[in-house]
Amino acid sequence: MTLWLPASGKIYLPPTPPVARVQSTDEYVERTDIYYHATSDRLLTVGHPYFDVRSPDGSKIDVPKVSGNQFRAFRVTFPDPNKFALADMTIYDPDKYRLVWACAGLEIGRGQPLGVGSTGHPLFNKLRDAENSSERQEGTVDDRRNISFDPKQVQMFIIGCTPCLGEYWDTAPVCKDAGSQLGLCPPLELKNSVIEDGDMFDIGFGNINNKTLSFNRSDVSLDLVNEVCKYPDFLTMSNDVYGDACFFCARREQCYARHYFVRGGVVGDAIPDGAVQQDHKYYLPADQQNTLENSLYFPTVSGSLVTSDSQLFNRPFWLKRAQGHNNGILWNNQMFVTVADNTRNTNFSISVTNDSSLEKYDATKIREFTRHVEEYQLSFILQLCRIPLKAEVLTQINAMNSDILENWQLGFVPTPDNAVHDTYRYLASKATKCPDAVPDTQKEDPFGKYSFWNVDMTEKLSLDLDQYPLGRKFLFQIGVQRVRSGTKRPATRKVTKTVKRKKVQL
């Protein structure tokens, strides 16, 4: 017998208020056929690969830390296109449009030869080799060793008009009723922060805050021990509603476990058989081996072969469609280029002597130094675009970032309150109120608190694309042939004379 029964599931209805739809920049940005080329100077940096070298009193940094395992975060500033003197005045009408830049292509140039760098720690927390163990070894008070290894191989760059967002693991706040946490593993939480110039990226030990999670200062290499190791938060940036942080990215990571070691110290989480008597689920005890050795295993990774066949740099990239709603529009005339590359990770060894009369080798009179150098050059192809000053377009831009309209001098004027304000004349006088109480009228840089490698392109733009390597590649890519300059010589005409024959009358 068939019976009709009421539906047991819930009925989901759409939300009553309308969902705000974010438009893609392709829906309101009008692109022109005017392209500019911009290239930076050769960007060089030199420093110590493991730490900052400070002055004897520690008051200043004599040699900065420059490691091949650091992020390079470039903040590129372009000129305001609304202040350009364009030859075609029909393109720009300040009463109807505002001009913006769009990134059409770029090339991140890298100098210096390929090389594998070595990092390590003179007091690395390594009890013994866990792969080729010949005999049992009991831990002592200090089992640290001088260990060196090559890092995981990383090539990566992220392009956007806002800084790249990174993620790392750090200690989380402890609950109030948790009691004393001395000697216990702290809770962990995933945190986000902007990737700044000089931040360390992951080389095989994970993206964690080593300042708070490495008490012994010997679990990682010397260049990571006092740093926060970050990794780009691709999930958050790809789900950004406006898509400003990451137009597109390219990455290549490779590694393999080269050595297998055991940590020294007391095991925090003991194997359950020996701790809570779980009926020998993990091992069977013996009379001769009634105590277990350390079980904190870890590998040291290697980046393996470095070759020019797998390089992401020194080659052009063209932006046709970005992954988010922002299809390459450079709001506020700036671009952020975040680069990670340790395939040119050679550390120089420099030796000097403190005895000018030394003629034979004496290690006690020779001082060894190490330095790391990096070389970059950034090139861009910019497309000139215009935005119509329509109400619906300005409303979305104002909701996205009101600073854009202020820079365009289109800020919304508030309703006057008809109040009389006080203006003091002598602010530095002791008879008036403290000048610090006067509000600062200077506009604050939203990214001023972060550290970037600033690259000024305000005087680096050119319309002659065929005069630059990236420009010639772009012209070839879009199928534009170069016009040969110069005056052509007229071809010589060959004049032939015809001879008339006289008629002879017979």
Curated annotation (Swiss-Prot):
Keywords: Capsid protein, Disulfide bond, Host nucleus, Host-virus interaction, Late protein, T=7 icosahedral capsid protein, Viral attachment to host cell, Viral penetration into host cytoplasm, Virion, Virus endocytosis by host, Virus entry into host cell. It holds the Pfam family Late_protein_L1. GO terms for biological process: endocytosis involved in viral entry into host cell; virion attachment to host cell. GO terms for cellular component: host cell nucleus; T=7 icosahedral viral capsid. InterPro entries: Capsid_L1_Papillomavir, Capsid_L1_sf_Papillomavir, dsDNA_vir_gr_I_capsid. It is found in: Virion; Host nucleus. Transmembrane segments: none annotated. One of its GO terms (molecular function) is structural molecule activity. Belongs to the papillomaviridae L1 protein family. HAMAP family: PPV_L1. Self-assembles into homopentamers. The capsid has an icosahedral symmetry and consists of 72 capsomers, with each capsomer being a pentamer of L1. Interacts with the minor capsid protein L2; this interaction is necessary for viral genome encapsidation. Interacts with protein E2; this interaction enhances E2-dependent replication and transcription activation. Forms an icosahedral capsid with a T=7 symmetry and a 50 nm diameter. The capsid is composed of 72 pentamers linked to each other by disulfide bonds and associated with L2 proteins. Binds to heparan sulfate proteoglycans on cell surface of basal layer keratinocytes to provide initial virion attachment. This binding mediates a conformational change in the virus capsid that facilitates efficient infection. The virion enters the host cell via endocytosis. During virus trafficking, L1 protein dissociates from the viral DNA and the genomic DNA is released to the host nucleus. This is Major capsid protein L1. It comes from Human papillomavirus 23.
